């Protein structure tokens, strides 16, 4: 009976931690794949067991009490220790099990990364992955994520960020658009064109770097279209709507087959860094550790990537 009670207490603490990190009982219930009534009942059981109120609830908000804040800090440590014990006793320290929740950018997530992720799952039959595609910054607690693949320089200093690779970029335009303007011979000539902006990376200016000298050029642009989608930028560039800066791998075939022109190839936008990002923790399960190893190994070899300079 005592063993059963201990397991129940761990489950109650897990539920409490999830309520705090998800921000509400309803969000915690969704992440735990249970009902809000069950989550509420577990919270009440933990409060009764401890003899204190942990969370103050109103119609619209939940707030930790002072006792709740102390309980959360202790419960977080207990859960981390319990997970480490389960790995060690269950002899799964090196064998990924359970569910790994990963957020990846739309472009990479539905294209280049699928093959290594599929092979990773075939290698570890007890592992499942929730592969969520989104270009926004990751909300690890609110969305119950284990890690995220981020493209770009903005990284939250409160997280662990591992540099995996970088993505070269190119300035491109359609032949039809170029035919309407004087020839492009300098970076300044690009200012005469309409542009397609990728709002995550550039909106009003584009900075270019000369590949054979320390020279740089900062170009003011006027976007006809702003988007957060790499594919939208590439596809609208093909229509002749404007000039775009895109990841080189997305337009390699278009350039080779003449659908797009690579402008000023000696002037390049800075390559975008690719990071694997995850929250700080005292304990990382085998599924996250193995996934990090996989990404470190395969990311620089993925089409369109290169090792960081």
Place the predicted regions along the sequence by residue.
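The DNA-contacting recognition helix of HTH DNA-binding domains
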Residues: 36-37, 110
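Short helix-boundary/capping micro-motifs
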Residues: 17-33
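C-terminal regulatory
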Residues: 138-142, 154-274, 301-309
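A short LG(V/I)-centered, amphipathic sequence patch enriched
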Residues: 47-64, 260
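Residue cluster at the C-terminal edge of the helix-turn-helix DNA-binding motif
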Residues: 22, 31, 45-53, 123
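Short helix-loop hinge/linker segments at domain boundaries
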Residues: 59-62, 66-69, 80-103
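Central regulatory/effector-binding core of bacterial HTH transcription factors
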Residues: 97-160, 308-309
